[in-house]
Amino acid sequence: FFDSGHEAGGNWRFLSSSNEVLWYSQRDDWGHLYLYDAETGVLKGRVTEGEWQVAEIIRIDEGERKLWFIGNGRESGDPYFRYLYRVGLDDGELELLTPDSANHTISFSPSRAYFLDSYSTPVDPPVTVLRDGDGAEIMTVQETDISALLASGWQLPIPFSVKARD
């Protein structure tokens, strides 16, 4: 599943300032972003690549030529954990902005200079931190306390792996 971050949905975004189209495709069996010239239809280049996938576009800064997106399967560990990345539209320089090995939910400030990063795993309760636009942690906003749950006898789930037939 891919979320273009646009109300109309779809697997593409038009970049009006550069007359380009950003297109999501699984042409190599992995979900990645490609940049096309909107006038000629010529592929200008891949924006992302590798054995992982882009899941959701969060924002595009056409002036800076940068794109923020959620991806999964790139970092070691659980391939379903979602991380926030930033990538250059022209150079493909990829930066991981949420390094903790967990599933991340992101909320940007109106200025986009900061974002809240709420992350957790099936066995680790949610933590919310404030990060600057480059992903540096500024402060912990909240840590979920599950001590009352544990004291009542509740047990954490036990992760397991099952080998697939294929």
Each language-model region and where it sits:
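Short, flexible loop/turn elements at secondary-structure junctions
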Residues: 37-40, 51, 101, 164-166
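Repetitive beta-architecture junctions, highlighting loop-to-beta-strand starts
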Residues: 31-33, 42, 80-84, 92, ...
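Beta-strand C-termini and the immediately following turn/loop, strongest in propeller blades
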Residues: 12-28, 37, 47-48, 61, ...
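Short loop/turn segments that connect beta-strands within beta-propeller blades
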Residues: 38-41, 88-92, 132-134
